[in-house]
């Protein structure tokens, strides 16, 4: 009996040991998978829903604790957009989205939310017009977690220039400089460098001279267009003060005040890159200004720093290194070289002449921008203290258009409690707007040659 057990043990032992090892490995795998399986099955948690309706486009944002996938399609008669969001279940937060639709939304009239199938929620947007939607996700950034973004753009994009002319139909006269450059474009190889227009130098007014020279539109000269760019907007609040003041709100208010003053000035008109609480990408801000053939671009901001004592106004222009980088990219882009040379369509066939004109445009932009900035700094000093007494240089993407003087104005430090209160005050906002208006007027009075040449 003992021998038989020993013999059985000898024959059966090897497979038994192998089986035991397989069982142990299987058990270990199960243990490793246990914490993962509930994670996979768990639906994402909705943290917030936000809507940003605007004439330009409406944005709907869903913020979640994990990344999701979404599919969408549109339907006609009537116009609708259907969005299927995977990895989420119906929740009170999604029902809240229904209540966030505003009656004045240009694109969305209503929406419905339902659990389409397990872990898939369907949102149906009833639309007021045909749209060209964009649906994408964003990784965590700033204070935000994962975001699913739904943008509702019009099927036919709005033209900033048409809107500007409709709202401010001042007569646009022929620009002789543009005509000269157009002639060059028609006959590039027969053009010598001596025939290129020579622009007079831009000289900043003396800092000791504080007399105000009102801008006067000369006969035959077209209306001057100023593009005002209130920073941030929509999902991007900009800097936030200790008292909860958001940069995007105060700079929009200052820009709107300045626009009203510019529009009331003969020979001038203003265009806002955003006129409400919505987000505009940096390159779109520049393209808008170029589309309306702006003669000057002013980006308006409120500064912030870790030390609450930091304060004062600042003015920035593009650094020469930044401008060189932009030029290098554009010159390397053969597709754009024929149509966009510093934003100036010259129809130039000679690449050597095109490069010279682009270099001239870039150099003139930096030179004129610095002149504007110096003038603005002097006027801001009249209404408030300066953070630094000289113009600052940096590679701001929004200042990289080579065909118009571009400056960025930091009105004050929203991180400074005293200046935060000042930025909230309507009278102080008006003072900043007046200072900028006077700076604009002084600049164009001293430099009447500066004009867009599109």
Feature annotation, model-predicted:
Residues 64-66, 85-87, 127-129, 152-154, ...:
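Flexible glycine-/small-residue-rich
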Residues 184-351, 362-374, 421, 434, ...:
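Catalytic-core regions of hydrolytic enzymes
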Residues 2-225:
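Signal-peptide-cleaved, periplasmic/extracellular N-terminal interaction regions immediately downstream
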Residues 71-72, 92-93, 235-239, 417:
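Short, solvent-exposed loop/turn elements at domain surfaces
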Residues 70, 296, 306, 357-454:
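Active-site-adjacent mobile loop/cap segments within catalytic or ligand-binding domains
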């Amino acid at each position: 009996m003992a021998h038989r057990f020993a013999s059985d043990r000898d024959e059966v032992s090897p497979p038994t040991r192998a089986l035991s090892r397989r069982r142990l490995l299987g058990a270990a795998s199960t243990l490793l998978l246990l914490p993962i399986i509930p994670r996979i099955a768990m639906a994402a948690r909705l943290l917030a829903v936000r809507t940003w309706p605007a004439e330009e486009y409406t944005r709907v944002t869903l913020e979640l604790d994990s990344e999701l996938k979404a599919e969408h399609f549109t339907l006609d008669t009537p116009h609708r957009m259907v969005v299927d969001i995977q990895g989420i279940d119906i929740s009170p937060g999604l029902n809240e989205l229904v209540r966030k639709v505003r009656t004045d939304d240009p694109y969305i009239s209503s929406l419905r939310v339902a659990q389409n199938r397990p872990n898939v929620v369907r949102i149906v947007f009833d639309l007021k017009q045909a749209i060209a939607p964009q649906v994408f996700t964003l990784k965590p950034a700033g204070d935000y977690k994962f975001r699913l973004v739904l943008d509702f753009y019009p099927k036919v994009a709005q033209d900033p220039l048409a809107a500007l002319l409709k709202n401010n139909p001042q007569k646009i006269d022929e620009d002789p400089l543009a005509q000269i450059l157009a002639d060059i474009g028609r006959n590039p190889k027969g053009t010598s460098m001596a025939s290129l227009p020579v622009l007079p130098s831009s000289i900043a007014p003396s800092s000791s001279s504080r007399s105000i020279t009102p801008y006067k539109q000369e006969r035959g000269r077209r209306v001057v267009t100023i593009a005002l760019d209130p920073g941030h907007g929509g999902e991007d609040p900009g800097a936030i003060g200790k008292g909860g003041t958001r940069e995007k709100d105060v700079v929009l208010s200052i820009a709107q005040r300045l626009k009203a003053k510019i529009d009331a000035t003969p020979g001038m008109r203003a265009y806002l890159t955003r006129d409400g609480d919505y987000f505009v990408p940096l390159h779109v801000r520049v393209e808008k200004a170029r589309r309306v053939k702006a003669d000057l671009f002013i980006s308006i901001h409120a500064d912030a720093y870790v030390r609450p004592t930091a304060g004062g106004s600042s003015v920035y222009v593009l650094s020469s290194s930044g401008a060189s980088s932009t030029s290098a990219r554009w010159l390397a882009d053969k597709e754009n070289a024929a149509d966009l040379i510093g934003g100036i369509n010259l129809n130039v066939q000679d690449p050597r002449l095109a490069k010279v004109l682009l270099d001239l445009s870039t150099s003139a932009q930096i030179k004129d921008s610095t002149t504007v900035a110096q003038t603005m700094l002097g006027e801001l000093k009249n209404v408030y203290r300066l953070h630094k007494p000289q113009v600052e240089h940096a590679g701001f993407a929004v200042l990289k258009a080579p065909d118009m003087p571009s400056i960025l104005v930091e009105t004050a430090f929203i991180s400074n409690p005293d200046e935060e209160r000042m930025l909230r005050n309507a009278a102080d906002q008006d003072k900043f707007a007046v200072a900028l208006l006077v700076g604009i007027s002084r600049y164009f009075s001293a430099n009447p040659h500066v004009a867009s040449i599109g």
